[in-house]
Design a protein with these regions (language model features):
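N-terminal charged helix/coil linker that caps or initiates catalytic domains
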Residues: 1-30
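Glycine-rich phosphate/adenylate-binding loop
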Residues: 2-3, 116-120, 125-133, 140, ...
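Conserved N-terminal Rossmann-fold NAD(P)-binding element of oxidoreductases
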Residues: 31-33, 56
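Hydrophobic/small residue at the entry helix of a nucleotide-binding pocket
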Residues: 37
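Aromatic pocket-lining residues of Rossmann-like dinucleotide-binding sites
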Residues: 45
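Glycine-rich phosphate-binding loop and adjoining beta1-alpha1-beta2 segment
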Residues: 50-93
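A structured beta-alpha segment of the ubiquitous adenosine-cofactor-binding alpha/beta core
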Residues: 78, 82-119, 125-128
Length: 264
């Protein structure tokens, strides 16, 4: 390690032990989805001394991202999120290597995009089929992976938890992901209604989501006749706040750093 690295990240060494710094500097982490949750993961990982990041996302910054996403600034509207974050990483730690992949991960490119021997893969996308695809591919290759539940509609950052995917409760996004993994990828099913450990860590909220209503009000109950499968998107769907999406990202990053720092 050079002097600039130890100056920047000596505080991390005093938190996890000096022996952890070379491991963090040598680590390569992929973040799939760098929006409301993923952008904060990138921020936390580069500030924790991770030496190489692969950022995977095809979205551009939109003005409606302002309430929840790190790259959303007045001068970045319309710019690739991956490019904005890569530039930010370079300002934080110029020695951090960043691989920019301006693509959405799909069935047709998953083998190529997840081909490197990543030390960790972080799933921060909000489509069930793609979450299951990422998890299944990493599981089959022996790549450590962690996945995020839904941050949309939540107000309370203190309700965020980390657990095994098989024990993640009623989070609808993770519940659908579990079902997809069991149906399409032969993951173990629950036994007599009891959760089965899946060896996949996940971050989720125990808070009930707040639903937006057409009249501008919000409720813990979905509006009659309205779409129930709301997503966190730019113009409609669940609302979101940075203090929740950021906390999701930081909890995910904390678990990645904890595991990487402990690996001999």
């Amino acid at each position: 390690m050079d002097e600039s690295y130890t100056q920047r990240f000596g505080g991390i060494g005093r938190l996890y032990g000096a022996a952890a710094l070379p491991r963090l500097q040598a680590a390569h982490v992929a973040i799939v989805g760098v929006g409301g949750v993923g952008s904060w993961i990138v921020e936390a990982l580069v500030r924790s001394g991770i030496g190489e990041l692969t950022l995977i996302d095809m979205d551009d910054v939109c003005i409606t991202n302002t309430n929840r996403q790190l790259p959303a600034l007045a001068h970045t509207i319309g710019v690739s999120k991956v490019d904005v974050l890569a530039a930010r990483v370079a300002e934080i730690n110029p020695a951090c290597r960043v691989n920019r992949i301006v693509e959405f991960l799909t069935e047709s490119n998953v083998d190529r995009l997840l081909a490197p021997n990543f030390d960790f893969v972080v799933d921060a996308v909000d489509r069930t089929s793609i979450k299951a695809l990422i998890i299944a591919k990493c599981h089959s290759r022996g790549l450590p992976v962690i996945t995020s539940g839904s941050a949309g509609g939540r107000r309370d950052p203190t309700a965020i938890r980390i657990a095994d995917l098989g024990h993640a409760g009623a989070d609808p996004l993770l519940r659908s992901t579990r079902q997809c993994l069991r149906r399409d990828y032969n993951f173990a099913k629950s036994e007599q209604g009891r959760p089965v450990t899946m060896d996949i860590p996940c971050v989720f909220s125990t808070e009930k989501p707040v639903f937006p209503w057409a009249d501008g009000s919000c409720s813990l109950e979905p509006e009659s006749g309205a779409e129930t499968g709301l997503r966190l998107d730019c113009a409609a769907g669940f609302g979101a706040a940075t203090f929740v999406t950021g906390t999701f990202g930081f909890v995910l990053a904390a678990e990645v750093v904890r595991r990487l720092a402990a690996v001999e």
